[in-house]
Amino acid sequence: MSQQETHGFQTEVKQLLQLMIHSLYSNKEIFLRELVSNAADAADKLRYLALTDDTLYEGNGDLRVRVSANKEKGTVTISDNGIGMTRDSVIEHLGTIAKSGTKEFFSNLSGEASKDSQLIGQFGVGFYSAFIVAKKVTVRTRAAGHAANEGVLWESEGEGSFNVESITKNERGTEIVLHLRDEETEFADDYRLRSIITKYSDHISVPVQMWNEGTPESDGPDGEKVAATEGEWKVMNKATALWTRNKSDITEEEYQEFYKHISHDYSDALKWSHNRVEGKQEYTSLLYIPAKAPWDMWNRDHKHGLKLFVQRVFIMDEAEQFLPTYLRFVRGLIDSNDLPLNVSREILQDNQVTTAMRVGITKRVLGMLEKLAKDEPEQYQSFWAEFGQVLKEGPAEDFANKERIAGLLRFASTHDNSAATTVSLEAYIERMKAGQDKIYYIVADSHEAAANSPHLELLRKKGIEVLLLSERIDEWLVNHLTEFKDKKLHSVTRGDLELGELEDAADKEAHDKVAEESKGLIERVKAALADSVSEVRVTSRLTDTPACVVAGEGEMSTQMIKLMQAAGQPVPESKPTFEINPTHPLVEHLNNETDEQLFADWANLLLQQALLSEKGSLADPSAFIKLTNQMLLASVK
């Protein structure tokens, strides 16, 4: 007796099923990933249960998953010889959304079996993804250890109900036949199915097989007979996960080949880290540092992240939740035993487990970079040339690791007058003068502009090293990285130089004397430039240049203003502080000028020169040229 019955889905919500079928997954081909994953689950369940009762194997312990297509009938079939289902479990588990036999099975495991289990079907709705491409789904199954006549047929069109019927099934396990919708017949193609299996299920430990047609006897090119070959089931996936093997058993060549496989990069990786984490969270990570920056590294619309596997089954590319944005160049994967996922597996749940994994993986990458910088400085310089600007985003994004990130940064400096960015903050501190308590830096549009800035004159004279920053992100960086190892970073173009103990008494006395003698000059310049500057004062930083402009404490620097303007952000009105060098011949000439109009023109000319030196451009270059020509003509008359 067939005992055919019709049941309504226990959720009793046809609309929910339809919504899930059409909206839950972001691409249709995922149906095969889900069904192959379920089949692998069934094999794993049988493997574990057979440890204590090997009669469940029924004389066949070669577990496998098989996928086949029939173009004429428009069907795709996925079968396994795993644990199978009884009639009751079919009704319970295939009749309820978000109910999973695997999850229930998993909760009953304990000890080492639980740790090593590769049961991935804790999501409850994977089976129903079949209806994304199928107008009808037929399931034939028999539980291991049960008689052949205890097989079950389950069939549904995904319309809110399903039929269940008892059948005879000689082989244990489950066979799922998808009757494809007319518009989805592309999936009834062996090549299409092979490509999906390779993409999503390459590293499932259970062999995934497809039928390889035999060939008839034929004539060779020289007339010889070529023997016929028989058709056979051929394994499509590697059926091994490299990252689950012992590190000592994996060669460098294997690591590099695997990197190329997952990254689609043609060149070798620079470095990698393969690590197994056990404890509260259990996962394996295999992280690669590329040798070259990917072409899309600066594309903010493109997702960057790690491949995510759960129990060796590919879940998604570009899982962004496990690394901060400033490490978006890292390639690799994570394979979790207990990672919580949303039911669709498409969106990771943002919770404490995910956060803890992110913290651990971030520390792992930073540790890898620190080791590279220490042990292979030349290799690290190659890395820095490719990814340094991205790493500079770190202090703003990752407060907890700010000090570690700062230790990885490299800059040009006045130490060797080279444009090469090879100087670490650690090395700078080691070379600091006795009594120096600040790390001095300058940010400019180019290395040349930074290296030749008049703001460096006194510091060069005293032999004080200055970091030369000239990348667009540098101003953003120093706004978030204000100190390193208790040494404050101090801009030489902002406020006072604050030399502290580096300023000897004789210099200070000389400066104070010049400032006192120049009070009248300062007042005249203030009056002449009242609309253009916020303050005029005697400089303490210039030795060879007549004047310069600096930003006041708490005011935006020139570079930050440029950044804001480039981003289309409103910039508050501000006027610079104008510093003059009374010992310079041009300023002495200015001081001796009795004609107030000429005095104002000279003062304005010096200001425009200082602004040009600082900004690289002027708001009104034509007016500056006119003024310059006017002063030149006056001097030759």
UniProtKB/Swiss-Prot annotation:
Coiled coil: none annotated. PROSITE patterns: HSP90 (PS00298). It is found in: Cytoplasm. Residues 563-637 are annotated as: C. GO terms for molecular function: ATP binding; ATP hydrolysis activity; ATP-dependent protein folding chaperone; unfolded protein binding. Residues 1-345 are annotated as: A. Keywords: ATP-binding, Chaperone, Cytoplasm, Nucleotide-binding, Stress response. It holds the Pfam family HATPase_c_3. SUPFAM superfamilies: ATPase domain of HSP90 chaperone/DNA topoisomerase II/histidine kinase, HSP90 C-terminal domain, Ribosomal protein S5 domain 2-like. One of its GO terms (cellular component) is cytoplasm. The keyword ATP-binding applies. Its main location: cytoplasm. Residues 346-562 are annotated as: B. Belongs to the heat shock protein 90 family. Homodimer. Molecular chaperone. Has ATPase activity. This is Chaperone protein HtpG. It comes from Shewanella frigidimarina (strain NCIMB 400). The gene is htpG.
